[in-house]
């Protein structure tokens, strides 16, 4: 028979406190603190309307501090840049393009067809090199999942086919770069530009294509050049769009090794024209990412391609209506796919 349990002394009972409650007073204190933070931020933002962030130290500090909290604590960007996984940043415009959100149309595709007709009358060839965007090659950094290939718009195949029907030679580098990403990184995590390794891979592919289809335009002699390796660190232009004041504090810097080449200069008399925007100018323009801000590093696409072809190129911005192509034999357009198919 089990012994009877001892009697409980009422004077020795344990007091269990009730669960804490969020009182009305505490709620008001939180609201007051939040309103105060917003008010201080608004004051500095109003001041920033009349001066830039760089000249308005207080506004710049407040913006930088608030963005640091949003990025580090809440994993949030701003209206222009979204945070992905593993420190990757993506421009909102690039996301909008792939989800068919509102975007601005352009006349690039129609302009290329017109340009091809002009060049054909002059017995010159138009060659378009299309480069995919960051999100097309690294979708898992924004939305986790297993991807068997690059993310494309349905319009891309149709637009490229129309260019080929117009007699334009098209190099769509999307699939090639998708395979190349297993060996090298194609784009930076915090910068919108391609890496020097990806740029060099495309220059090699284009050099091979030109030598096969236009052998007379490439030189068989090795040019005399002076090559120097430049080690550069940069926070990235996407980080600067989040925090212009102190971008490196958000996610740190990324590194790039540039091959600066002296001895291949642009030549307006060259039979080969190379058109391009930032894809072409990055690593040549000191004001762009990893450019150093001082003198031109001379490590961009035009320099690399000219070295491989063994001749100087007529380097220009994107095609304009009044451009002349007298005595030109080959016109190359280096374009982001987002410009070709917005």
PLM features per residue range, with description:
Residues 1-342:
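Extracellular glycan-modifying ectodomains
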């Amino acid at each position: 028979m089990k012994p009877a349990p001892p009697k409980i002394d009422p004077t020795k009972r344990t007091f269990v406190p009730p669960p804490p409650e969020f009182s009305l007073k505490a709620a008001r204190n939180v609201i007051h603190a939040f309103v105060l933070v917003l008010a201080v931020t608004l004051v500095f933002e109003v001041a920033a309307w009349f001066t830039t962030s760089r000249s308005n130290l207080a506004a710049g500090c407040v913006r930088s501090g608030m963005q640091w909290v949003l990025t580090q604590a809440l994993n949030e960007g701003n209206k222009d840049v979204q945070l992905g996984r593993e420190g990757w940043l993506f421009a909102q415009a690039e996301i909008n393009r792939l989800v068919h959100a509102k975007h601005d149309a352009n006349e690039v595709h129609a302009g290329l067809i017109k340009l091809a007709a002009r060049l054909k009358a002059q017995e010159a060839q138009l060659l378009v090199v299309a480069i995919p965007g960051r999100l097309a090659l690294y979708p898992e950094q924004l939305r986790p999942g297993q991807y068997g290939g690059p993310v494309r718009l349905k319009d891309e195949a149709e637009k490229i086919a129309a260019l080929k029907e117009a007699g334009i030679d098209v190099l769509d580098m999307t699939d090639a770069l998708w395979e190349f990403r297993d060996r090298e990184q194609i784009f930076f995590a915090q910068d919108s530009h391609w890496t020097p390794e990806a740029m060099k891979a495309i220059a090699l592919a284009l050099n091979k294509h030109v030598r096969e289809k236009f052998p007379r335009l490439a030189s068989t002699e090795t040019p005399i050049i002076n090559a120097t390796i430049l080690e550069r660190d940069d926070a990235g232009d996407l980080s600067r769009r989040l925090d212009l004041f102190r971008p490196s504090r958000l996610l740190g810097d990324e590194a790039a090794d540039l091959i600066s080449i002296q001895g291949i200069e642009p030549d307006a008399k060259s039979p080969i024209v190379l058109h391009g925007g930032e894809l072409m100018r990055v690593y040549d323009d000191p004001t762009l990412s990893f450019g150093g801000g001082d003198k031109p590093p001379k490590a961009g696409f035009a320099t690399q391609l000219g070295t491989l072809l063994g001749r100087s190129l007529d380097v220009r911005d994107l095609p304009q209506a009044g451009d002349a192509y007298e005595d030109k034999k080959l016109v190359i357009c280096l374009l982001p796919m987002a410009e070709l198919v917005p």
